[in-house]
Amino acid sequence: MENFPTEYFLNTTVRLLEYIRYRDSNYTREERIENLHYAYNKAAHHFAQPRQQQLLKVDPKRLQASLQTIVGMVVYSWAKVSKECMADLSIHYTYTLVLDDSKDDPYPTMVNYFDDLQAGREQAHPWWALVNEHFPNVLRHFGPFCSLNLIRSTLDFFEGCWIEQYNFGGFPGSHDYPQFLRRMNGLGHCVGASLWPKEQFNERSLFLEITSAIAQMENWMVWVNDLMSFYKEFDDERDQISLVKNYVVSDEISLHEALEKLTQDTLHSSKQMVAVFSDKDPQVMDTIECFMHGYVTWHLCDRRYRLSEIYEKVKEEKTEDAQKFCKFYEQAANVGAVSPSEWAYPPVAQLANVRSKDVKEVQKPFLSSIELVE
């Protein structure tokens, strides 16, 4: 395995943050913790229900980690929506992360998918059964156009996860394959459409702006995620089917060339995002900018992405990119580095245990280094 290209990664990340004029001021610390706990608490109670526990069959520690990661993503990025919308989106996107980590073969339970859908029968695939049950709670926040995007993008995501189970990076020469798979499993349209709740945005009068935002967000959010995930995925055997690695196989290019391709696409998309909406409806631009800044903060602060390791490695270096990266990282940490012990309680496993014993909800938080993922 070749060495991680630290200098290149620093330069790319710094340019990205400069292009989007990164300055996350979405919340005060108190507001951030309040929203995190509200969304987490509702989502944790949802996943602690016996039906969810029985059908998902997810390791409690992994479910806890997935929930904490997703609540952070939603609260940090969807800064302009209501707390109730944050909570419902947190549940939906936690389901997607659970599916993304699943290794179960979907084929047997998808044979009659459309027949069951048309007849109004419960889906045989347990994930779809649970997601469909929760979907009305999500869609109630949005108009019909945005709702259709959420439904369609979620269906695409399921199919993308199905494809990923084959660990197939594409045939050499199949240049369309990497972006085909990334668009399918990236949830870009779901994310782009879920920024516009109907209580805040009239999707009929802002139809062109919302449509354009969904189109731009599809690539921007997945490319930024791919770029900022590159470090954690670089030498992880479980993360070898990524956009960059698929470019290497399908385009028959080097890893450096593949990373450069992703870099240029991400930077161009960032320029577009700012340029296209800077003179449009101010509320639309504000929502997009808050999302971009919060999304970056989440990546820099969430332990899943391990970017603190890059910071520790380069914080004593005197190069311009190293110093700029560290400044951005510290800026993000000042607003976004919040310990889960301050908001992610009680653990899902404890709530599930309480429910199974038919005991009333525990009032005092119980924090365990085993059950709560720091």
Swiss-Prot record:
Binding site for Mg(2+) 3: D239, I241
Result of changing D104E: Does not significantly affect the KM and kcat for farnesyl diphosphate
GO BP terms: sesquiterpenoid biosynthetic process
Pathway: Sesquiterpene biosynthesis; trichothecene biosynthesis
InterPro entries: Isoprenoid_synthase_dom_sf, TRI5_ascomyc, Trichodiene_synth
Key word Metal-binding present: yes
Chain spans, region Aspartate-rich domain: 100-104
Keywords: Lyase, Magnesium, Metal-binding
Chain residues that bind Mg(2+) 1: D100, E164
Induction remarks: Expression is positively regulated by the trichothecene cluster-specific transcription activator TRI10. Expression is induced between 18h and 21h growth on GYEP medium. The initial detection of trichothecenes occurs several hours after the initial detection of TRI5. The initiation of trichothecene biosynthesis occurs with a high concentration of glucose remaining in the culture medium.
Effect recorded for C146F: Leads to the loss of activity
Function (record text): Trichodiene synthase; part of the core gene cluster that mediates the biosynthesis of trichothecenes, a very large family of chemically related bicyclic sesquiterpene compounds acting as mycotoxins, including T2-toxin. The biosynthesis of trichothecenes begins with the cyclization of farnesyl diphosphate to trichodiene and is catalyzed by the trichodiene synthase TRI5. Trichodiene undergoes a series of oxygenations catalyzed by the cytochrome P450 monooxygenase TRI4.
Family: Belongs to the trichodiene synthase family.
Protein's UniProt name: Trichodiene synthase
Native source species: Fusarium sporotrichioides
